[in-house]
Curated annotation (Swiss-Prot):
Residues 1093-1201, 1364-1401 form a coiled coil. Residues 206-227, 645-669, 873-882, 1242-1252, 1533-1544 have a biased composition (Polar residues). This is Histone-lysine N-methyltransferase set-9. Residues 587-597 have a biased composition (Pro residues). It comes from Caenorhabditis elegans. GO terms for cellular component: nucleus. It is found in: Nucleus.
């Protein structure tokens, strides 16, 4: 053991502290020892011999043969000591146990009781052992063999597991020398019997010398007294006990008492006259006594039959000093029997210092009952003095090398593969022990100290020998310096094997490694010396047997030679001595018995059969020679397989199979029993072996060769050929063929029941089929099954399913199940009462249909097979593939049993892979030699347990079930639920493409499995899953052992590769009760915690995102609701505004209607009318004038668009906003600012002339004469222009635009006006667009651009804007003009009054009637009548044709200005009285003009000459206008010579019309400029109506001359010469 360890065994015995007593005088005085306790045995051989020749060493075989031992009793009262040596037991007193004290190191420093250090001579004497003393420790817990087993195999135990836990408790059986023999130990570890051998008692024996000394009566020498003493702790307080290294000693390890001893003190140890016990080592050498106790703690003892003076001291005193002789020659102490020592401290004289180990201590037996098992004793460990020591086995193995095979073969890098191949060529084959009882030995090799002068030569460890002393008599011994070490070969072999399992249960190394030839076991050299031993002698290379080259690494020649040697290799005897070196066996030891070898299964054959799937290549023959060679090898392999299969009862006749019961045709095949695996059937090769194991209850079946042949089946169908046996239909005698169903669902295969022997109808003999499929069916038929179905039939054809509760079978169709149904936990209707979807009658009819189909298929198969049988002639099997018939090369049915079901994806994957060489043979062997079966390992816990010894790399069982891909099955990660995941089919190596996991294969053993479904997982597995690919894409997944597995051992597999992803606890077979101790479970829990934390983090992030999304949606919903509420509010406001507008409009229409009715009633009806011809002529003239005006407008628009810049337009728009009237719309409704601004004249409505007195005056200079106060009367012409008002509806069509007569051109005054800003049509377009948006949208939000609003403008636009000082000056001028206009209005009223009086005069018949009045004119006339001027004026004289009425200067000036301003005025809307006038077309206008109208009397005052006017189409109000409000194209001027005649109403007759030449519009337009300026004398035509003017101009005919112009007066000429602000 290592330094510092103080282990106490479970059965340690402590002694209570005895009461302080006075030392008895009978005790001999102790001998003072001058050395520290336990310093080793003297090296001098004479001391050892002197010990053996001492007279006190009398053999104790006669005394101890029939002696019993008892516990020490409680100290009674003093008794009389008898005079004869009689052993008397005392009453048992149980001791008081106290806690042991940590013992100090018993080397390097003296004990606390030793005050004097040892001298140099004493130290040398203490370190003087005998040369031939070698102590072997074969049962130490720290031996290297156990470490190797743990490192290579990861075994939780070693072969020393059943020994006592402490080395002191182990008994070494004597094999040579005069040892005291023992008969054994009882159940309480007590020595049953002990004696000395007969040859040990002789003339020169220690016993003889003892008798001689006893007869002489001489006392014992001081040196021999110490050899008799045994180191024995007294009964005292352990806390005060001295630090000793010796173990308590008593005879046989029992506490004894002797007669005559003091009753107050128990006798401990050995006295001179008592029964002596010879202390010697394994080789018969005596050992000196060491480590005596101080006297103050030593017990007292009475010598028997001896005087006090003859007693010798047993223990030395701490303070006293002995004699020089005692100090110079200390007495060696003999160890107890069975003790062992280390070889320590190599000294110059050769040999070593043996350090005494603790002896075994047996428990004493009681007379009255069993021994007390609670008694314990302290165990003290003896430490060597030299710490520089190295322990290793005699045949040590090297340290566990770098295990390349820990990596799975398909995950190895190319460098690892190369290193593994190199290791496979260099290492030796494993060596197995010859006998289980032989164990490895351990020696201590000590480094030589620097001060040592020489060293004993160490034998070479390669020879695997031990330094041992021969068996000799004591008298024949020679001095040590003359002795020569004898080399004897060892008697044992060190078992060094390897495994494929992971040495340390790390999570990263427990993936299922693949068993291929790329990862063979590593063998360590059995005779290799430890590398850490300095000055090691060169060793001979060990004799090893290299492992044969794997098949996938063989060349073609090596393969041929290997298969050829298979037969001869099997005939050789296989024993452990054949593989061991010949020089390792000792000559005098008989050879050990050979180990148990499974004869049908050979290790070399396994190596030949198992081939790596990853390295295998197709063996396609290229030449006829290759084909012949391959055929021979195949035949040789088949015969070799038949050799050992024939031992089980096969014969040559059994290798012929008959097709359909006929012997005419035979086929050569391999005799391998293919049986149907089922989880209910028993193993086939059950053999009864004498054993008392717990799993041997079911091993009573007969061997295979002794079993009678089972009765053959009465019929055979395709399912039985395909290894899917079915039952026999009820009531049928003909062969039935069942259609093979798809096994993709939950249906299970129902094994056939044992049936009676049926006679064949063809030959009258027993129907026998010798092929492998039928044999497998017959073997499976041994099991009986029960069919209890809903339909009432008991046949087993079709898809059936087994109830998990009562283990009965039902038809799936009768239970309402399909192949796709989930039947993992199916129970019948009896175990789980429920209502079935199929009634009994329907189920019976369905089964009848199934049976009919089976019968029809059987008849069809029979008809197909009969002609083939007649053509067969040969019945002898062919020995060559070339000579075989063609039918054998292309068999109709596969010969390999398909014991598995495959999904579509799995089948596609397997068909694309290459076949493994020898796979069919290996699969047949695994099915034939099953080495495990299901058993109960615990209560209600079944597992797979081995039924035979399984060697490493042997196949135990084949896993059968439903093979599918991992993506097709729902499984539990890590393994479980009878589903095994296999990753051996994955492609690629480490560092390459490992695939996407689609090649992970899962085998579901619940559907079609065998006993492998009960295999459990473990963190220290002893098996793995491997695979081979046979013919017809048959995947064989097998359980292969990774170490030697003994019988009755549970088979465990590693966890699946995805065990970390499991959410439930792993079911570890090693830690079922303490799962937290499993490293895999701990790792899985850590991964699960990390995975849960990641999932919680993701959930938290998702929750935060969800909350943020909900908050965003909530805010959007709030904004949406606010917008909807605002929109609704605005819609309601707009609706209210529109309703208010409609109500106001309706009210206005009612008022207008009333006014029109009143005016119509007040106006006199006109009797005069014009003819249709005259009306047509007027219409043609007006049409011509309209066209001319339109052409002029287009030209003017083009000219303005070219000349007007954007800056001017914006300035004009700004000015228009400033000059726009505020009360343009009479309806009181809110409107945006853009609707209140004044824009282009194309869309800007005219302002109403009926403004309230509180309104500010209009800023537009062109409208200041048009907007008079409401209280003042206006003339006819002004009222016509002022009646246009703004309408709420914006007109977008061009036909709704109305222009005045002078809109197409400019007067000279307008042309000369520089301060008038041009019309801004850009603003009109913007307003038009805004109005369109307002009309189409529900929310009226019109926002003008920034450059239109009142924001800051750029410098260019600011420079182009008009000067506000000039605007204010213009406003003042307009106010002055308004005052002047009021005065003129007063004068005009007098003229109108005159005209009214003129209308009242009677008209003549030939005089044309007045022009018709419009409704508006009538209405205004009524107003003028009501409103009389303030100052009455004198009515003017009546105008006549010769004397036209003259106007004053102010009146003419105002009228001229008004005409100038209104020349470019555009009227696009109806009058104010009519909010929405009715629009008419030109056709309606012509139809209205064609109607007869009465000529009305001219009631308008004379006005200035203006251009011609084309009536608008926008209503009746503007059509029937007076002539005075229309500028004419031609008027009398200074260039016209024709006089103008005005027919006054007072003239009695109409004048004769004169011829008037009608000028063209161009001629009239040339003269209008002067006429428009010279308006001093108003012509008479302006006071006429339209008809009067037509008659005056044209007369009754077309040639009517125009009236002459009025004469010019001085006032007129002077007025024209006066400059005005428009000139």
């Amino acid at each position: 053991m290592a330094d510092g360890e103080h282990t106490l065994p479970a059965d340690e015995e402590l002694f209570e502290q005895p009461p302080p007593q006075q030392q008895q005088p009978e005790i001999a005085e102790p001998i003072v020892m001058a050395q520290e306790p336990i310093q080793g045995v003297s090296e001098d051989p004479q001391a050892s011999e002197a010990t053996h020749e001492a007279p006190d060493n009398y053999p104790v075989d006669h005394q101890m043969e029939n002696q019993e031992f008892y516990h020490e009793p409680q100290i009674p009262e003093p008794q009389q000591i008898p005079q004869i040596p009689v052993f008397q037991p005392a009453a048992y007193n149980p001791p008081n146990y106290v806690a042991p004290q940590q013992r100090a190191n018993n080397f390097g420093e003296p004990a606390a009781a030793d005050a004097r250090p040892l001298t140099e001579q004493e130290q040398l004497a203490a370190e003087r052992p005998t040369e031939d003393t070698v102590w072997i420790d074969s049962d130490d817990d720290t031996d290297v063999e156990e470490a190797i087993l743990r490192a290579n195999f990861w075994l939780p135990y070693s072969d020393h597991n059943y020994d006592p836990p402490d080395p002191a408790d182990r008994i070494i059986l004597p094999t040579e020398g005069p040892f005291p023999c023992i008969a054994g130990l009882d159940e309480d570890c007590n020595i049953v019997k002990q004696w000395m051998p007969e040859d040990a008692v002789g003339p020169g024996s220690p016993g003889t010398q003892y008798r001689r000394n006893q007869q002489a009566g001489g006392g014992l020498p001081s040196t021999s007294v110490a050899s008799q003493q045994q180191q024995l702790p007294v009964r005292h307080n352990i806390q005060n006990r001295p630090m000793v290294a010796a173990q308590p000693f008593s005879i046989g390890g029992n506490q004894v008492e002797y007669g005559g001893m003091d009753s107050r003190m128990q006798q401990r140890g050995v006295v001179r006259d008592g029964p002596q016990y010879r202390v010697m080592n394994d080789f018969g050498n005596g050992l000196p006594m060491r480590g005596l106790l101080p006297p103050r703690n030593s017990p007292a003892a009475n010598a028997i039959n001896r005087a006090r003076e003859q007693q010798q001291q047993m223990y030395h005193q701490a303070g006293a000093r002995g004699s020089l002789q005692q100090r110079a020659a200390p007495a060696p102490a003999d160890p107890t029997p069975g003790s062992y020592q280390h070889i320590v401290n190599a000294v110059p004289g050769g040999g070593a210092n043996p350090m005494r180990r603790v002896p075994p201590q047996a428990r004493p037996g009681m007379i009255g009952g069993a021994a007390n098992n609670n008694r314990a004793r302290p165990t003290h460990v003896t430490r060597p003095m030299d710490t520089q020591e190295f322990e290793h086995p005699v045949a040590p193995a090297a340290a566990p090398p770098h295990r390349v095979v820990d990596v799975a073969p398909h995950r190895m890098t190319p460098e690892q593969r190369q290193e593994l191949q190199q290791m496979n060529r260099q290492r030796a084959a494993p060596q197995f022990p010859a006998a289980a009882a032989q164990r490895s030995a351990e020696v201590i090799v000590i480094q030589q100290r620097p001060g040592a002068s020489s060293r004993a030569p160490r034998p070479s460890m390669a020879q695997e020998d031990l330094l041992r002393s021969p068996t000799r008599r004591l008298s024949e011994r020679v001095p040590q310096e003359h002795q020569t070490p004898v080399l004897e070969p060892r008697r044992f072999q060190v078992k060094v094997t390897d495994t494929y399992s992971t040495p340390i249960p790390k999570a990263s190394d427990q993936l299922p490694a693949q068993l291929t030839e790329e990862d063979p076991p590593e063998e360590s050299a059995a005779a290799a010396a430890p590398e850490d031993v300095p000055d090691a002698a060169p060793e001979d290379p060990p004799k090893v047997i290299l492992k044969p080259t794997p098949p996938h690494r063989m060349t073609q020649e090596e393969k041929n030679a290997h298969f050829a040697r298979l037969t001869t290799d099997k005939e050789k005897p296989t024993s452990s001595t054949s593989i061991l070196p010949q020089d390792a066996a000792p000559p005098h030891v008989p050879p050990p018995p050979p180990p148990l070898v499974l004869r049908p299964h050979h290790q070399d054959e396994t190596l030949a059969m198992v081939q790596s799937v990853f390295e295998s290549k197709p063996r396609q023959p290229d030449t006829p020679k290759d084909k012949e060679t391959i055929s021979k090898i195949a035949d040789l392999l088949r015969f070799s397989a038949d050799e050992f299969t024939g031992q089980s009862g096969s014969s040559a006749a059994a290798r012929q199979r008959t097709v359909s019961g006929s012997a005419a045709r035979a086929q050569t095949y391999q005799m391998h029993h293919q049986q149907q695996q089922h989880h209910h059937q028993m193993p086939m090769d059950q053999r009864k072996r004498p054993s008392s194991g717990r799993y041997d209850a079911l091993m009573g079946a007969m061997p295979l060769q002794q079993q009678p042949p089972p009765p053959p089946s009465q019929f055979q169908h395709t399912d039985s050929i395909a290894h899917r046996p079915r039952g026999r239909p009820k009531g049928t005698r003909h062969p039935s063929v069942a259609v093979q169903p798809q096994r993709s669902g939950g249906a299970r295969t129902l094994p056939p029941r044992a049936q009676t022997v049926a006679m064949s109808a063809r030959n009258g003999a027993n129907a026998k089929n010798s092929d492998s499929e039928s044999e497998g069916i017959d073997e499976a038929a041994e099991e009986s099954w029960t069919m209890r179905c809903h339909c009432g039939m008991d046949h087993g054809d079709g898809d059936t399913i087994e109830c998990e509760g009562c283990k009965t079978w039902q038809h799936m169709a009768c239970m309402g199940l399909t192949l796709k149904s989930n039947t993992s936990k199916y129970k019948c209707e009896m175990c789980l009462p429920r209502r079935l979807p199929v009634s009994k009658a329907e189920a019976a009819r369905e089964q009848e249909r199934i049976l009919n189909r089976l019968r029809a298929a059987a008849r069809k198969q029979k008809r197909k097979s009969e002609p083939v049988e007649q053509k067969q002639k040969s019945s002898q099997p062919s020995t060559s593939r070339k000579s075989a018939p063609m039918a054998l090369q292309q068999p109709a049915e596969p010969r390999v049993a398909q014991l598995n079901d495959y999904s579509k994806q799995a089948s596609a994957l397997l068909f694309g892979m290459e076949q493994t060489a020898g796979a069919d043979t290996l699969l047949a062997e695994s099915r034939l030699h099953k080495k495990a079966r299901r058993m109960f390992v615990e209560e209600a816990v079944e597992a797979l347990v081995t039924t035979d010894l399984v060697q490493i790399r042997q196949v135990i069982l084949e896993v059968n079930g439903h093979v599918s891909m991992s993506s097709e099955v729902k499984r539990q990660p890590g393994g479980g639920n009878c589903i095994f995941m296999y990753d051996g089919l994955m492609k690629g190596t480490a560092g390459e493409d490992m695939g996407d996991g689609q090649e992970l294969v899962c085998i579901d053993t619940k559907r079609k499995g065998n006993d492998t479904k009960f295999t459990r997982r473990s963190c220290v597995p002893n098996c793995v899953l491997k695979h081979v690919l046979g013919s017809n894409a048959t995947l064989g997944i097998m359980i292969v052992a990774t170490k030697d597995i003994t019988r009755n051992t549970e088979v465990t597999l590693p966890f699946d590769a995805d065990w970390r992803e499991s959410e439930v606890e792993l079911e570890c077979a090693e830690h079922m009760k303490e799962l937290q101790a499993c490293p895999f479970e701990s790792e899985r829990r850590r991964f699960a915690a990390e995975r849960h934390r990641a999932m919680d983090h993701k959930k938290q992030e998702a929750e935060e995102a969800r909350r943020a999304d909900e908050e965003r949606r909530r805010l959007e919903e709030e904004v949406r609701r606010e917008r909807a509420a605002k929109t609704k509010q605005m819609d309601e406001a707009e609706k209210a505004r529109l309703e208010a507008e409609k109500a106001a409009e309706k009210e206005k229409k009612a008022k207008e209607r009333k006014k029109m009715e009143a005016s119509a009633a007040a106006a006199p009806e006109s009797t005069n009318s014009i003819t249709a011809r005259e009306e047509r002529r007027i219409q043609q003239a007006e049409e011509m004038f309209r066209r001319q005006e339109e052409e002029g407008k287009r030209k003017e628009a083009r000219r303005r668009s070219k000349s007007v810049t954007p800056g001017v337009l914006e300035a004009a728009g700004t000015a228009a906003r400033e000059d726009a009237p505020e009360a343009s719309i009479p309806v009181p409704a809110p409107s945006p600012p853009a609707s209140r601004r004044s824009v282009s004249r194309t869309t800007q409505p005219s302002t109403s002339s009926f403004a309230t007195p509180t309104e500010p005056p209009a800023k537009n200079k062109r409208m200041r004469s048009v907007v008079p106060p409401k209280s003042e009367p206006a003339s006819s012409a002004k009222r016509v222009r002022a009646t246009t008002v703004a309408t709420p509806k914006a007109t977008t069509a061009n036909d709704s635009r109305k222009r005045t007569a002078s809109a197409t051109g400019k007067t000279p005054v307008a042309k000369r006006s520089k301060n008038v800003a041009p019309t801004s049509f850009a603003l009109a377009l913007i307003e038009k667009e805004l109005r369109e948006q307002a009309r189409n949208s529900t929310v009226l939000e019109m926002i003008l651009p920034d450059y239109i609003m009142n924001e800051e403008r750029s410098g260019l636009l600011a420079g182009q804007s008009p000067d506000f000082s000039e605007v204010r000056a213009q406003i003042e001028e307009e106010n002055r003009m308004k005052e002047r206009s009021r005065k003129r209005e007063a004068k005009k009223k007098a003229v109108e009054k005159e005209k009214k009086e003129h209308r009242k005069e009677p008209k003549k018949t030939n005089e044309p009637g007045p022009a018709p009045k419009s409704e508006k004119a009538v209405e205004k006339a009524v107003e003028k009548v009501e409103k009389k001027p303030k100052s009455p004026q004198k009515p003017p004289a009546k105008p006549t044709a010769q004397n036209p009425p003259l106007k004053k200067t102010e009146e003419v000036d105002g009228i001229e200005r008004e005409a100038s301003e209104s020349s470019s005025k555009e009227s696009s809307v109806a009058p104010e009285e009519k909010k929405n006038p009715k629009k008419i077309t030109f056709a309606e206008y012509n139809s209205r003009r064609s109607q007869k109208r009465e000529a009305g009397e001219c009631s308008t005052p004379p006005a200035v000459t203006r251009r011609g006017f084309i009536p608008s189409t926008e209503g009746e109000d503007l059509v029937n206008v007076e002539l005075s409000a229309i500028p004419l194209d031609d008027h009398p001027s200074s260039s016209n010579t024709a006089p103008t005649t005005t027919i006054a109403p007072s003239v009695g007759g109409a004048p004769k019309p004169t011829s008037v030449v009608v000028k063209s519009p161009s001629t009239r337009s040339r003269t209008r400029g002067a006429a428009s300026e010279s308006a001093d004398d108003a012509p008479a035509e302006h006071s006429m109506s339209l008809q009067d003017r037509v008659f005056s101009m044209f007369g009754s005919t077309v040639d009517a001359p125009a009236p002459p112009p009025p004469p010019a007066s001085a006032e007129t000429n002077s007025r024209r010469s006066r400059s005005t602000r428009w000139n």
